[in-house]
Amino acid sequence: MEYRIYHTIKEIVKHAEDTYGSCDAVRYKTGKDTIEAKTYRQIGKDSRHFSDAIEKLGQRGAHIALIGVTSYPWLVSYFGIVNGGSVAVPLDVALPAEELCELMRRADVTMLVVDDIRKDVVVAAKNTCPSLQYIVSMGKEPAEGCLSMKELLAQNAEDIRVENTESTRAENAKGTDTEKEIDPDALCTILFTSGTTGKSKGVMLTQRNLAENATCLDMKIEENAVILSVLPIHHAYCLSMDILKGFSVGSTICINDSLMRVARNIQLFRPQIMLMVPLMIESLAKKLEAAEGLPAEVVKEKVFGAQFHTIFSGGAYLNPDYIDLFARYGISVLQGYGMTECAPVIATTVAWNQKKDSVGQLLPNCEAKSVDGELWVRGSSVMSGYYKMPEETAAALEDGWLKTGDLGYVDDEGFVYLTGRKKNLIITKNGENVSPEEIENKLSTKRLVAEVLVREAEGVIEAEIFPNQEYATKTGVEDVPAKLQEIIDSYNKDVPAYKRVYRLKVRKEEFPKTASQKIKREN
């Protein structure tokens, strides 16, 4: 396979359709253990029909919101929107209706494509989004006043069939979506940051941002690899690496229908690759640990299947012990680093080139430097700005450089090392700067620590910990708070006084998290 870099999403989809037309592009469940598939040729055709339907509604170039779980109709909608010259605004399906409507108003949305499970959003949008002109339902039972996506696709297919029987076929073809050029530097997607603190911002990403980010590095993913997609579809990491990267190499994308059924769906779809956040990886690690003592190949077959070989991890810090654990079963865990503002990958680890403690090597289309300890990056993946937020854009971008807000540096070979977030820095009474993430990462290596948040409280450093009760029970720990204090005391012995944790708080519940499973910090 000759590897190529693409500059528009439309190029990726066209390449996939031309090269892998009869291969399965998407597989999804239609019952407990039944699967249906759609080919690359089918999704290419359906997305073109949807592009044409959008144009006939007068919405070409419009901002179109997408609200739904990962599904075949969601993918058809997204490709139909961006390949037809409009702007997709994917939103978190789990957000309250009021918040979704606010985001649609802020993004100047004039058309909404929505899943049937959010009929409450349809009602709210009709009442509170005056600019909204059309609502299209992706489901089988559209709410009152909604257009049916299925009917729009069928009608457009019929229109094309009629046109192609007439003598003006060539003239008509000139006006179809398939002949229209897409500007690589045109805005195509607005993604709202989930944000661990503060107001979410609409990140403006161009065709080039997304297409080049997904394809600028040949990660040696085999053609037609089977990928199980478990991350939220509105999340940049899923969109770029599961979908766009997957389409560029002809992968079969299998849709996980629930986070409660990941283990079952691994057995059903038999994937080779998965993109995950550390919380998910830790959950699967427990299944491996529960089978300790059995031959590695037996355990791997039971949990993942013999064909499974790679996990890409991103979104948060991953305890290195888990990388070693999965390696014993012949599974590579490759870490990456990125942010929505970079579409989203900045650096990634590949199996043949790794360095201890690094989050990965810069992508070929990216350069980085450290300014006063903060990592700045520049390249074709960097956003054009925040939608209608000029002050925030000016604060984030300087001469093409994106200020990541992360504390870190890059070595001579382009490997990135992180120490924390600039905005989370704790300034001690004697003027020392302490990165809470640095402390959190060290404490997280202890199995009794399920989740931890470090902050300043009344002039001292405090660690709030949600313990791993399952591990405590398994290992016979009766006094969990006392054992956690021992962990804190052990940590304190090895660090300077200004980095020591002087207060421990034990939680009874998990921390609230963002859609990408990051712990929410206080404003």
What are these model-predicted stretches?
Residues 21-24, 137, 157-192, 199, ...:
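Conserved pre-ATP/AMP-binding loop-to-beta segment of ANL
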Residues 37-41, 188-214:
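Conserved AMP-binding A3 loop
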Residues 44-49, 184, 203-223, 230:
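Conserved structural elements of the adenylate-forming
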Residues 95, 112, 379, 385, ...:
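AMP-binding/adenylate-forming catalytic core of the ANL superfamily
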Residues 354-356, 382-405, 436-441:
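Conserved ANL (AMP-binding/adenylate-forming) active-site segment centered on the GW(Y/F)…HTG consensus within
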